């Protein structure tokens, strides 16, 4: 028998907690026998003293096991179950292409995604811009669509990792969000409850990333890889660039359009292509669907070229209540803003730096994201035709096209975009799309 306050005291005094102590505390969180004040004190003790890797694994497993853990064995899938998770960014629409691409190569991708958080866009918000798309199907439909389309992207139900929900809500109001141990357990408890064989993490680096520095992003990637593998799920991570908007668009319906155009080959942003291919290739290799990255890229290019990846996306959308012609007639099913006008820089030159976070907040400011959880989203607004770092701007080349509801909103967004992008006379050095991979042997 343990007491919550004694477990808190031990962590406060920088002692290493046992697996049994952590299990007891998290079970209490799930059963409401541990108070909000005790959760806050525990989170702050961890914040100041951190956790060892075995403690992080125990915390992740306890939070994963606090609710339902999906078992797919009865579905008799004829391929591996694989997923990816991104720490979030702006114009980060990779999930919408990556799920169908991996599915078309023989994987099964039951992806449980989140809403937008702060300046970052949420995959669920993007999908909800498609009329009829059901992000909260019952488990039977989730399984059925995953089996038939190879991919299903849905929201987190209350019975998956419920302890995390309570812990996260408390961390959010007690200044304990930015802690590697707690972030690791929060991300992985939800992901591992989805019953995955393997996972690829996309950890963002740069001005639009969740973590403030490259070193912090790398530390998080290593923590996630070590803990997930320690918890029994084969996991690798890629550190990818978020010093500029990843896609050509930022905004919900705009990003869905771009994802569909990417899958059909109508238009592929080169940076988005590099990141999507790198993540997909890693997913195929880790799931034993390809022997190496080169073979994986050949398979992925084939399913883009022959239309199988686009077909998987269409099947998923239709299976989850959306239209059956989203690929062919996407404009009929996605909202369009009333005002679509370019914004120009005040001077000519090279795009030197971009505050990607501020660009994300410009989209939120137009109603494309939530300031508080109860806000409703305007799916049509956002940015498109985004300029990239190193490109030249002048009176003919705009920084972006702004999609707004009215003139006032357009002007506010235009001011924000201009303030977020620095123009200089010298061309900056190019940054890579993918900085490095972190595999289990690296941690």
UniProtKB/Swiss-Prot annotation:
Pfam families: Glycos_trans_3N, Glycos_transf_3, PYNP_C. It comes from the Bacteria. PROSITE patterns: THYMID_PHOSPHORYLASE. HAMAP family: Thymid_phosp. Belongs to the thymidine/pyrimidine-nucleoside phosphorylase family. It comes from Aliivibrio salmonicida (strain LFI1238). This is Thymidine phosphorylase. SMART domains: PYNP_C (SM00941). Its EC number is 2.4.2.4. The keyword Transferase applies. GO terms for biological process: pyrimidine nucleobase metabolic process; thymidine metabolic process. One of its GO terms (cellular component) is cytosol. InterPro entries: Glycosyl_Trfase_fam3, Glycosyl_Trfase_fam3_N_dom, Glycosyl_Trfase_fam3_N_dom_sf, Nuc_phospho_transferase, PYNP-like_C_sf, PYNP_C, Pyrmidine_PPas_bac/euk, Pyrmidine_PPase_CS. It catalyses: thymidine + phosphate = 2-deoxy-alpha-D-ribose 1-phosphate + thymine. One of its GO terms (molecular function) is 1,4-alpha-oligoglucan phosphorylase activity. Pathway: Pyrimidine metabolism; dTMP biosynthesis via salvage pathway; dTMP from thymine: step 1/2. The enzymes which catalyze the reversible phosphorolysis of pyrimidine nucleosides are involved in the degradation of these compounds and in their utilization as carbon and energy sources, or in the rescue of pyrimidine bases for nucleotide synthesis. Keywords: Glycosyltransferase, Transferase. The gene is deoA. Homodimer.
